[in-house]
Amino acid sequence: SLFELGKMILQETGKNPAQSYGAYGCNC
């Protein structure tokens, strides 16, 4: 899910979810 994806990205980058999504783009 998006929530789980956000948690994974947050752990990998250690940055805010918004910044991570901006880098990854929309993984919809």
UniProtKB/Swiss-Prot annotation:
The keyword Disulfide bond applies. GO terms for molecular function: phospholipase A2 activity; toxin activity. One of its GO terms (cellular component) is extracellular region. Keywords: Disulfide bond, Myotoxin, Secreted, Toxin. Expressed by the venom gland. The keyword Secreted applies. One of its GO terms (biological process) is phospholipid metabolic process. Its main location: secreted. It is found in: Secreted. Snake venom phospholipase A2 homolog that lacks enzymatic activity. Shows high myotoxic activity, neutrophil activation (demonstrated by activation induction of IL-1beta production), and slight cytotoxicity against Jurkat (leukemia T) and SK-BR-3 (breast adenocarcinoma) tumor cell lines. A model of myotoxic mechanism has been proposed: an apo Lys49-PLA2 is activated by the entrance of a hydrophobic molecule (e.g. fatty acid) at the hydrophobic channel of the protein leading to a reorientation of a monomer. Monomer. Belongs to the phospholipase A2 family. Group II subfamily. K49 sub-subfamily. This is Basic phospholipase A2 homolog BmatTX-II.
